[in-house]
Amino acid sequence: MAAAATIEHVVLFKVRDSTDPSKVDAMVSNLRSLASLDVVAHLAAGPVLPRPHRSATGFTHLLHSRYRSKADLAAYSTHPTHAAVVEENVLPVCEDIMAMDWVADLDSPTAAPPGSAMRLTLAKPKEGATAELTATLAQVKLSAPAAVTQVSYGENFSPARAKGYGVGLLAVFRDLEELEAMDAGEKDLVESVKEKVRPLLESFIVVDFEVPPPPAATL
């Protein structure tokens, strides 16, 4: 399949510990409902997977969506339905939010199937290291193990809510078992990648996420 430019949009949420679980469920449900907007090519939202050894800086939930163009992303961002969900369901329960957008060349379908596992890495490159980091990630994509069904990476073009993080990397796996098997069985490869990118980074955030089933249709 020929590579197609796709706009990646990822948002990390940190829900307050004291939040009523029903309000958290409402936030997730309403975020998932945004998949029905015409401009959205793919959208999934839910809790990040607990990983004590990962640098997630306390973020509890993730939204990942894809768009056919920057114009579609802009239309989503300003859509009244999206604005209402943010105002009514997100801001009242979250103590921290960050977001990143980048352009990715995908050579596989835009929508990640339900049950897929994702590992999202947000990187804050050292000064002057962004170009070298993205070039390194291009090599990582080429050498990705068979368990990885899709790799997306790129330089953030929306700095306002990114807290200085400038590069995103998203690896998609067939399922959670494949992701965990890679961690266990491909340690040399994982460490090799870390050795290449660590000198280029000021800091990074890593979260794992499982793509949920699509929201049930309403009649």
What are these regions, as identified by a protein language model?
Residues 1-64, 68-78, 92-191, 195-219:
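Short S/T/G/P-rich N-terminal loop/turn motif that feeds into the first structured element of a domain
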Residues 78-82, 86:
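A short mixed-secondary-structure module that forms the rim of ligand-binding clefts
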Residues 89:
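A short beta-strand-loop micro-motif that forms or neighbors metal/cofactor-
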